[in-house]
Amino acid sequence: MYPAHLLVLSAVCVSLLGAANIPPYPLNLINFMEMIRYTIPCDKTWGHYADYGCYCGAGGSGTPVDALDRCCYVHDNCYGVAENKHKCNPKTQSCSYKLTKRTIICYGAAGTCGRIVCDCDRTAALCFGDSEYIGAHKNIDTKRHCQ
């Protein structure tokens, strides 16, 4: 191997080692976005669901406006159980899963944080795929509609 190749290989390895110290915060969000993209219609992106209804996005209050918003309500509650009952941190918890044959398979032992969070995300993503997206419910006035 040429010295230049060794130099490049070394630089790549050092870069990868440095990347291993990146906090896992975005990892679960990336996993969840990937699950959503797998289950929703092609003309939508996960961003369509980020500020939808009363519960899709940050926070949530009131009564869900439709079936899709109920998916987010259930997901929020699932994360709440993961945090309060199981002492998991859903936003930073990595998980193992497989996208196959129009479904999502979560791996890991039942009751572990990775599996609990994966099951929350899987259920929500499949629910998104089964629910109608109503454009009028995107960016609604939550002070008016979500009391």
From Swiss-Prot:
Residues 1-19 form the signal peptide. Binds 1 Ca(2+) ion. GO terms for molecular function: calcium ion binding; calcium-dependent phospholipase A2 activity; phospholipid binding; toxin activity. The active site is at residues 75, 121. InterPro entries: PLipase_A2 (IPR001211), PLipase_A2_Asp_AS (IPR033112), PLipase_A2_dom (IPR016090), PLipase_A2_dom_sf (IPR036444), PLipase_A2_His_AS (IPR033113). It catalyses: a 1,2-diacyl-sn-glycero-3-phosphocholine + H2O = a 1-acyl-sn-glycero-3-phosphocholine + a fatty acid + H(+). The keyword Acetylation does not apply. GO terms for biological process: arachidonate secretion; lipid catabolic process; phospholipid metabolic process. Its EC number is 3.1.1.4. Residues 20-27 form a propeptide. Gene3D superfamilies: Phospholipase A2 domain. Expressed by the venom gland. Keywords: Calcium, Disulfide bond, Hydrolase, Lipid degradation, Lipid metabolism, Metal-binding, Neurotoxin, Presynaptic neurotoxin, Secreted, Signal, Toxin. Ca(2+) binds at residues 55, 57, 59, 76. Heterodimer; disulfide-linked. The A chains have phospholipase A2 activity and the B chains show homology with the basic protease inhibitors. Snake venom phospholipase A2 (PLA2) that inhibits neuromuscular transmission by blocking acetylcholine release from the nerve termini. PLA2 catalyzes the calcium-dependent hydrolysis of the 2-acyl groups in 3-sn-phosphoglycerides. This is Basic phospholipase A2 beta-bungarotoxin A2 chain. It comes from Bungarus caeruleus (Indian krait).
